[in-house]
Amino acid sequence: NCPYCVVYCCPPAYCEASGCRPP
């Protein structure tokens, strides 16, 4: 899951799919 939940990185599933990383 995504440990860093931010506005453009939620929900966790989207975070994983987008490859989002903490700033």
Swiss-Prot record:
Query: Which residue positions does Proline amide occur at?
Result: P23
Top-level taxon in the UniProt lineage: Eukaryota
What are the GO cellular component annotations?
Answer: extracellular region
Q: List the disulfide bonds.
A: C2-C10, C5-C15, C9-C20
One of the entry's Gene Ontology molecular-function terms is:
toxin activity
Where does tissue-level expression of this protein occur? Expressed by the venom duct. Is present in all duct parts with a highest content in part 2 (proximal of the venom bulb) and then decreases in concentration toward the end of the duct.
Q: How is it modified after translation?
A: The C-terminal amidation is described in Ref.1 and PubMed:23031820, but not in PubMed:22709442 and PubMed:36235146. Ju et al. (2022) describe a disulfide connectivity (C55-C61; C56-C69; C66-C68) that differs for the usual one.
List keywords of the entry alphabetically.
Amidation, Disulfide bond, Neurotoxin, Secreted, Toxin
Where found? Secreted
Keyword Zinc-finger listed? The answer is no
What other comment is given for this protein?
A: Shows a very weak inhibition on Nav1.4 and Nav1.8 sodium channels.
Q: What is known of its domains?
A: The cysteine framework is VI/VII (C-C-CC-C-C). Displays a mini-granulin fold, a structure composed of two short, stacked beta-hairpins connected by two parallel disulfide bonds. This newly described fold is derived from the same cysteine connectivity as knottins (ICK fold). The name 'mini-granulin fold' comes from the structural homology with the N-terminal region of the human granulin.
- Described function: Causes convulsions mice.
* Protein name as it appears in the record: Textile convulsant peptide
Q: Which organism is it from?
A: Conus textile
